[in-house]
């Protein structure tokens, strides 16, 4: 949870995408086998950052990771956001 929260704060402070992504990746790695939403939300946020900077291949990779996860709080909403991002990139 620490890395996820840190990345969220850094994102709101408009810190470097590189730093934000690195912290989301740590949250993703540490949370993969835990049933909380931090790991899938981290994958989603990484995907959204990559979408925003037009790095669509990287975005799709992380959005697919997000969609492959299940059994966590807010799953439906997080998956809807990931699918919407993939739809935007396919247009």
Task: Walk through the language-model features, giving the residues of each.
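A conserved position within tetratricopeptide repeats
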Residues: 27-29, 35, 67
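Residue-level detector of the short coil/turn that links helix A to helix B
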Residues: 14-15, 54
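Residue position in alpha-helical solenoids
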Residues: 30, 45, 68-69, 85
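"A position-specific structural signal for the A-helix of alpha-solenoid helical repeats
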Residues: 3-7, 38-45, 78-87
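Single-residue signature of alpha-solenoid repeat helices
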Residues: 19-20, 59
């Amino acid at each position: 949870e620490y890395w996820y929260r840190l990345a969220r704060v850094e994102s709101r402070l408009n810190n470097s995408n590189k730093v934000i992504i690195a912290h989301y990746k740590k949250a993703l790695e540490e949370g993969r086998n835990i049933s909380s939403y931090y790991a899938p939300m981290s994958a989603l946020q990484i995907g959204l950052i990559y979408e925003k900077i037009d790095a669509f291949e990287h975005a799709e990779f992380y959005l697919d990771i997000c969609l492959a996860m299940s059994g966590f709080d807010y799953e439906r909403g997080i998956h809807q956001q990931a699918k919407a991002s993939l739809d935007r990139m396919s247009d």
